[in-house]
């Protein structure tokens, strides 16, 4: 009789142990389940908001430069992390396509950052302007790569509409910027002289191999091949000659008139044409 009782108790212990092991195994499996890309990016956004809501008014310029650098680094680290995982998980053909896209984005970002920094004219604000632009563009690109990775993993990934607006504004293409300036802008009515910004395929002075050509009546002809930097508000060109460099800037001034500046250095583009 005692043997039967002991056997029964032993069986109960075995069953309980199996159930506990099963529960523990299930719990461990759930704990080891990778975090969704949606949640991962949401956490980065929370950290980003902390920077956005910092007490900027109490900071000196040097501290603002450092803080914007850290803010940019937050998104750059996440971008690199996503790219590392994408490199491992994409098929070879798609990886090659995304790599080409990524290289084009890096080139575009570098030109944007240059263009933003130039607006400080070499002042102490330059680093902050460059960091802000790099951060905004990197944040936008992070969402693109996050979407790619979520797709590979068959996860849902939704970009809130407000964030999507910010993303669209952060990374305009060079083509979109040229379209803002497209046209023939008269600066001397008597001579009919103007600054022309035209698609190369329809331009009488089109530069071979380019998409956009910029020309001045009786003056220089440049193209998108000469773009040195740009923002959503301006385009800066650089043309290297044997004994000097020529710089040009295309923008709308404070009166919303097209302005085309020229000089032999970034800080001295003093030869300015203003079109009506």
Can you describe what each PLM-predicted range is?
Residues 83, 191-232:
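N-terminal glycine/threonine-rich, aromatic-flanked beta-hairpin/loop signature
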């Amino acid at each position: 009789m005692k043997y039967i009782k002991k056997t029964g108790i032993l069986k109960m212990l075995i069953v309980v142990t199996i159930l506990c092991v099963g529960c523990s195994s299930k719990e461990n499996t759930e704990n080891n389940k990778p975090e969704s890309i949606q949640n991962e990016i949401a956490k980065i956004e929370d950290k980003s908001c902390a920077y956005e809501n910092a007490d900027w008014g109490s900071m000196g310029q040097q501290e603002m430069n450092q803080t914007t650098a850290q803010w940019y680094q937050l998104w750059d680290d996440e971008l690199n992390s996503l790219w590392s995982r994408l490199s491992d998980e994409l098929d070879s053909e798609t990886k090659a396509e995304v790599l080409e896209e990524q290289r084009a984005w890096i080139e575009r970002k570098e030109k944007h950052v240059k263009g933003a920094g130039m607006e400080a004219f070499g002042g102490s604000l330059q680093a902050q302007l460059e960091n802000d632009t790099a951060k905004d563009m990197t944040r936008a690109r992070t969402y693109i790569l996050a979407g790619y990775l979520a797709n590979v993993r068959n996860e849902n990934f939704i970009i809130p509409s407000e964030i999507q607006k910010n993303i669209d504004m952060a990374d305009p293409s060079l083509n979109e910027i040229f379209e803002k300036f497209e046209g023939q802008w008269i600066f001397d009515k008597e001579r009919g002289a103007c600054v022309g910004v035209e698609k190369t395929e329809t331009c009488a002075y089109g530069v071979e191999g380019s998409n956009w050509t910029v020309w001045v009546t009786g003056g220089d002809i440049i193209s998108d091949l000469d773009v040195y930097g740009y923002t959503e508000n301006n385009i800066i060109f650089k043309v290297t000659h044997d004994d000097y460099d020529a710089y040009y800037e295309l923008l709308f001034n404070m009166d919303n008139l097209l302005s085309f500046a020229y000089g032999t250095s970034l800080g001295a583009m003093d030869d300015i044409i203003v079109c009506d």
